Curated annotation (Swiss-Prot):
Keywords: Cytoplasm, GTP-binding, Hydrolase, Magnesium, Metal-binding, Nucleotide-binding
List of residues binding GTP: 165-172, 190-194, 212-215, 282-285, 313-315
Gene name for this UniProt entry: obg
Organism: Latilactobacillus sakei subsp. sakei (strain 23K) (Lactobacillus sakei subsp. sakei)
Protein name per its UniProtKB record: GTPase Obg
EC numbers on record: 3.6.5.-
Domain OCT, first and last residues per copy: 352-430
Chain sites annotated for binding Mg(2+): S172, T192
Named cofactor requirement(s): Mg(2+)
Amino acid sequence: MFVDQVKIDVKAGKGGDGAVAFRREKFVPLGGPAGGDGGRGGSVILVVDEGLRTLMDFRYRHHFKANSGGNGQNKQMYGRGAEDTFVQVPPGTTVRDADTNELLGDLTEDGQELVIAKGGRGGRGNMHFATAKNSAPEIAENGEPGQERSIQLELKVLADVGLVGFPSVGKSTLLSVVTSAKPKIASYQFTTLVPNLGMVQLDDGRDFVLADLPGLIEGASDGVGLGIQFLRHVERTRVVLHLIEMDDQTGRDPYEDYQQINHELESYDPKILERPQVIVATKMDLPGSAELLAEFKQKLAAAGDTHEIFEISSITHQGVQPLMNKTADLLAETAEFPMGDVEEAQTQKLYQYQPEGPAFNVEQDEDGTFYITGEKVERLFKMSNLDHQDGVMRFARQLRSMGLDEALREKGAHDGDLVAIDNFTFEFVE
């Protein structure tokens, strides 16, 4: 098992702006405000698709954006709400905020959904701001900005296919040819000390996880060499590719190697041999390999062994593609292992109280301008429609009620000093 990780950027849609409008109809002299509300912005939602096995698709697309809501209209008509954007992920995906590492959710069940970027609410139209003192307000809210963040997706991946065989039969070389994995490769035994995994993606869209597992030796089922540690990984694979090298320079008998590996597998767990196993004759580009293979087939037939044999050369790529296609076919016919079979360390969640930050911060620049920052005040600014005088006055009252005037005075602001919020600058008035 290994953890696949990918980082994506998501942005929810902005809410639609509320409208400033008035009824202008015949025989309705006191029409009043009639500006409708903006529509809700679309959210970005992760949804579990049990047909997915990996995070491969996110290697090619990193940005996901939802549409904004429609603006409000005259005659109290609401703007259209935007549709949500759904992003499919495989079961077992853990979702974290990439900046804070906060755990946002664990997605395990097919169809389970998680909102990772919430769409902004629509701004209110001027029909909401009529009062006894102001029956024709030119006040409307802009739509709330949609949530924008970076997300870290993590998937604990079990290998679908395991490469087994004696050390240096070509497992690491084959893995490097069919995936983007870069295992350590050399012509001596026990090059691979830990499992290397890679994603195989076929032209027809099928994909699976292939594991290059440490080489077996006699007595592995009793713990010799890498022993039990290796066999535990084989136990979790659904298809076994048994690699036998056809190299007459090693002085080894391919059939004896084949029998010995299967004996170790059976000694550890007889059920392993019940899984689909394909014999892969490697290094078929070497002189004398054809003769060795013919002898191997004769011994196999004499023993009544009917396992299918694929001849490959990882150097020339001979026979590699048919082998991968056959492997994908076998996986389609073989049941998956439940995620619960994997032993997980028990972890205790610790929840800490996070006090809400200040509504705003005031800092004075070298040029004397006072800059106002803070999530709450910036959100208020973005939702304020400052195209009309009524909207400007309402925004000023809201800032005053938040205590901004007093905070500016404490920082030394005087009448006429410049104050900036985001890209909006105004003069401080005592």
